[in-house]
Amino acid sequence: MQINKKEIKQNLKKWNEEKKSIKSFSFTGDIILDNVSYTYSKKTPFEFRALDNADLTISDKKITCVIGTTGSGKSTMIQLTNGLLISETGQTIVGDYKIPAGLKKIKEVKDLRREVGLVFQFPEYQLFQDTIEKDIAFGPIHLGADKEEVYKKIPELLDLVSLPREYAKRSPFELSGGQKRRTAIAGIIAMDGKTLVLDEPTGGLDPKGEEDFMNLFLRLNKNQGKRIIMVTHNMDQVLKVADEVIVMHEGKVISKGSPFEIFSNQELLSKIQIEPPKLYKLMYKLKEKGTDLLNKNIRTIDEFAKAFKEVRKGK
């Protein structure tokens, strides 16, 4: 039998292209990290294993907060979700995208990053265009969106992040720090993905700015069904917005639950050296004095006051 070298080359090329594809067509909506590991500066004196056979499922259409001390693997984990990093072991599944360990190149990387928008800490430092509208439009246009359609949406995006519409033609470098951050986040929202991933989104903001951003993320989740994944050291923010909390420690996921379950677990918080929200500090002290409110699923000071009165009446 004669060997057709041309046909073999074509088949090999096709096989290699298919190997790089991450489309699995098994959409569940969840983000799954299955036994993933990642090491920085391998085979150097600075080698650091950031993720160590970590397993994790992040539900669709929820606000999930990721907590843990510096170096616990939080930022590395979120970079796996949109292909900025690729794990050394296991696999990362994002809806109907499956990213196996060791993959050299992601064929559908633009599609993946359109679906999962990643906002780094201090995103305002990434602004570079000469007007706000150009900065907002850059990401979605770069990923293949229609330019005209993107620009049509800019007034609504400015409304969404509480910036005046007339700011569209301004230079982003004329804005305050908080306004620059709103512009950067508007650019990620403009890609219209299902998931918004945020790394310390309120770092460096004043209390009013923090509250504004938390309310924005709540609106995106409740009104548009966006999945929000937020890395933060601010436990008061976690208590306010989270549906689920993921606890990371030394490259592993060691706990997952509602904010009430996590913050009621004093032993867990002590182990990972995380300070609880102010309300829970108060409830810990009350428990020591005989008044236990830790099972009341309290988020706000008003809910605390109501529960405290009810418990005191019962006594």
From Swiss-Prot:
- What GO molecular function terms would the record report? ATP binding; ATP hydrolysis activity; ATPase-coupled transmembrane transporter activity
Question: Which Cys residues form disulphide pairs?
Answer: none
Spell out the GO cellular component terms annotated for this protein, sorted alphabetically and separated by semicolons: ATP-binding cassette (ABC) transporter complex
Instruction: Write out the coiled-coil annotation as residue ranges.
Output: none
Q: What is its EC number?
A: 7.-.-.-
Q: What class of enzyme is it?
A: translocase
Q: Where is the ABC transporter domain?
A: 31-275
| Intracellular or extracellular location(s) | Cell membrane
What SMART domains has UniProt attached to this entry?
A: AAA
Q: What family is reported?
A: Belongs to the ABC transporter superfamily. Energy-coupling factor EcfA family.
Q: How does it assemble?
A: Forms a stable energy-coupling factor (ECF) transporter complex composed of 2 membrane-embedded substrate-binding proteins (S component), 2 ATP-binding proteins (A component) and 2 transmembrane proteins (T component).
Query: What is the name of the protein in this document?
Result: Energy-coupling factor transporter ATP-binding protein EcfA2
**Organism source for this protein?**
Mesoplasma florum (strain ATCC 33453 / NBRC 100688 / NCTC 11704 / L1)
